[in-house]
Amino acid sequence: MRLLLAALLALSGPISQALAQDFSLTIKDHKFDPAELQVPAGKEFTLKVVNSDVTAEEFESDDVEKLIAGGQSATITLGPLDAGRYEFHGEYHEDTAKGALVAK
């Protein structure tokens, strides 16, 4: 029994690290929240974008364009990214829907 418990505890480290690679953003009132999100450099990760507005919005950057209907969400796999700042915006509300991923 102790051996099983030790094995489960040893495995929980990699599991929690995998879970730490999932991030989320919310679109509300045509703004991204949080507006800046820190992500790991050099690793692939998933970004869930939840659109809480009733109207559609796009999550758009130099390399990604994803339309998200009002009240819906989308999961995007990104990376690996070099260390740096990667800006994104919402195409339909560019004046307010702005943000950045900061890879460290």
Give the residues covered by each predicted segment.
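N-terminal edge beta-strand
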Residues: 20-42
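Extracellular/periplasmic metallocenter environments
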Residues: 24, 70-104
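Beta-strand-rich interaction surfaces with strong enrichment in secreted/lumenal proteins
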Residues: 35-37, 63-68, 77
